[in-house]
C-alpha cells in the first residue's frame, strides 16, 4: 500500500471526512489544518466514492497531503492515528485498532449541542461510544469542534502512550460486546438510532 501510493517513511495519519460534499466542506478544512500541524505524520485522505480528486484539491491546495480512493481499509491498516467524522467510519477505525479523534462540524454549534444533549436519548454521536456505552473516544462536535481542541486531542492521541493504550482497551471492550449473543441486533438498533438522530 505504501509503495503503491508513493507514501514516505513517516507514520500515516488517516483523514476520514465523510462521504457527502457538504460534510466534507464543513469538516475537511479544519481537519487538514490540524493534520498539517504535525509534520512528523503524513496525512492521507480517504476519498469518498463518486467524488473526484479535484474536489479535494480545492481544500488541500499546496499542502503535502495524499488522497486514496477505494482503499479505506488498507489506509486504516497502515495508519498510526485518524481524524474521523461520526458514522460507521468510527466503528471501522476502531476495528482496525487505530486511535482516533471524532470531530464533526454542526452549524450553529451551541444550539446544536444543547438540542443534542437535551432532546436525543443518547449521550454519544460515534458508534464506538454508543456500542461501548461509555466514552472510549473523544467526540468534538458542536461547540467543541475547533482547531485548538482537535489539535490538542490529536496531540494526546499521538504522543500519550498510556492514553492510546486505554483507547485500544476500550476498542477491545467494544469488540467483546459485539461478539456476544444478539450483537447484530444490538448494533443495528444502535446504528438506526444514530442515523435517525442525525437526519436532516
Language-model segments: residues:
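Nucleotide-activated sugar donor-binding and catalytic core shared by glycosyltransferases
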Residues: 1-196
